[in-house]
Amino acid sequence: IVYLTVKMPVYGRRLKNTAGWERNVNFFTQYQKKGYKSNLAVSNVFQKAGFFPGAHGVPDLSRLEDDGDSRNIDLPYSKVNHLKVTTHQQYAWEKFILSGDIGYQNNHREEWSAFHTHYGTQPLPETDPDKELAFNLNTFSFSAKGRWIGFSSWEHRMGWDSQFQRNTISGYSFLLPEYDRFTTGISWLTTYRPDNTLSVSGGVRYDYGRMRVFAHDDPYLATYLQEQGYDEEQVEFYRWNSRRVNRSFGDYSLSLGVVWTPSMRHQLKVNVGRSFRLP
């Protein structure tokens, strides 16, 4: 294996420190009485996996020597934990069904590696000095839907959903910036079936989203560039890992469709619409 122009040996035909282990737990419960239905689901997934030392961090042949244990996990390694909690609530009347979903997710990923840097001015962190990268993404989601069957041939569906995300970071290195993201949308869909051969449907939806990305700079890179003789304009350009962004988006989508089934062997579909997708 060649890493950063250095040939890294593989002893005993085994990639050292590539073992891993994981644990998962799931829980689900449901309750139903007459027109009311409810459920709750909880899951948690954890994984820890080692990285081959010969392809991560500063090349060091001494770290590749066999330690006699093919299952241990040493630096460098990654840890990932995903927690998910969701609940579904529904109540049905004679001609109307109302349902809602609420959810929460936490995605936490960390990468650990012996502290290393490209710049001599970057000090060893006082807390968790070997934590290279960490991402903590929290997601909250909500949706509500209504279905109304006013007549046997006419059906209406309404919906509203929202989601909020927040990502925070830590560690002595950088990969992704901190950000907040909010999205929401409302929709209406109607379907008319005068008989078993014809179906006409139409709908409209409006979506809105806001993205806020936090700025992140590298002062140690800026110092290095200044020492190398770069002018202030170049230093200011390269020092930022991410720039501050605060943008909002919103637009509508609509569609109209017809399905005609004159016989068991023939079916004609016609659809026309306009779509918008949040970035």
Where is each model-derived feature located?
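Short acidic, glycine/proline-rich loop/turn micro-motifs
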Residues: 7-13, 112-114, 168-174, 213-216
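Transmembrane beta-barrel wall of Gram-negative outer-membrane proteins
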Residues: 1-3, 12-52, 77-93, 97, ...
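Transmembrane beta-strands of outer-membrane beta-barrel pores
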Residues: 3-5, 33-35, 44-48, 93-95, ...
